[in-house]
Regions:
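The Walker A/P-loop phosphate-binding site
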Residues: 2, 19, 23-24, 34-140, ...
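Small-residue hinge/turn detector
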Residues: 1, 12-13, 27
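Extended, structured, electrostatic nucleic-acid-contact surfaces
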Residues: 10-22
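Conserved inter-motif catalytic segment of the P-loop NTP-binding fold
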Residues: 108-193
Length: 193
């Protein structure tokens, strides 16, 4: 299981029987028992509202660099969740991503940002401009951003899986940006769904 990427209780607890059977060759019944044991040990049931409030108190926010935008978002982009920015072509989604990458590094100086670029929109010169505007050294900020250019949906999925390896290698990844999450899937799976 470990060699197949199931190296935490959580990864086992949220797996399907079929995934464990395929990864390890165990029977369906054994996979079910392993998953149930992982779920039992993690206490993956309900929580009280008080428990949820305590968890919410530990949520941090990454500033956008704009006080007005931060106010609209309740203080910035929440950590620990997936946030999607969507809009028409040219509506500044990529600019938000670039600014957020710089602001993350400003807020967490030892952090790293992972940027999966599916439309060839990552612009290091724009990052440098945002860094200068934030009072940071552009070269240092650029060194803290890992960029992967995804050429199709399979490559995009591979890059997403490699983020786990980056974290395991000790990089303090605080932000993952995928620009654009759906572009390759829309192009490759036309008419499905």
């Amino acid at each position: 299981l470990i060699m197949s990427g199931f190296d935490t209780l959580l990864s086992i607890a949220v797996a399907t029987n079929g995934q464990l059977v395929e990864a390890s060759g165990v029977t369906e019944a054994t996979a079910r028992k392993i998953i149930h044991a992982a779920r039992d040990s993690m206490n993956m049931g309900f929580s009280t509202g008080t428990d949820m409030m305590e968890k919410r108190e530990n949520v941090h926010r990454i500033s956008t660099g704009s006080k007005n935008f931060d106010t609209l978002l309740g203080g910035g982009f929440e950590t620990g969740v997936i946030t999607e920015c969507f809009g028409q072509y040219g509506s500044s989604k990529t600019q938000i991503a670039h600014s957020l990458a710089v602001q993350c590094i400003k807020q967490y100086p030892e952090s790293r940002v992972v940027f999966i670029d599916t439309e060839n929109t990552f612009r290091p010169e724009r990052i440098a401009q945002f860094a200068k505007g934030a009072g940071l050294e552009p070269e240092q900020v650029l060194a803290q951003i890992k960029v992967g250019r995804a050429f199709n949906s399979d490559h995009q999925m591979l890059l997403a899986e490699k983020i786990v390896d980056i974290v395991k290698e000790g990089d303090n990844v605080k932000l993952v940006i995928v620009d654009s999450l759906t572009a390759h899937f829309r192009a490759e799976f036309v008419g499905r769904g």
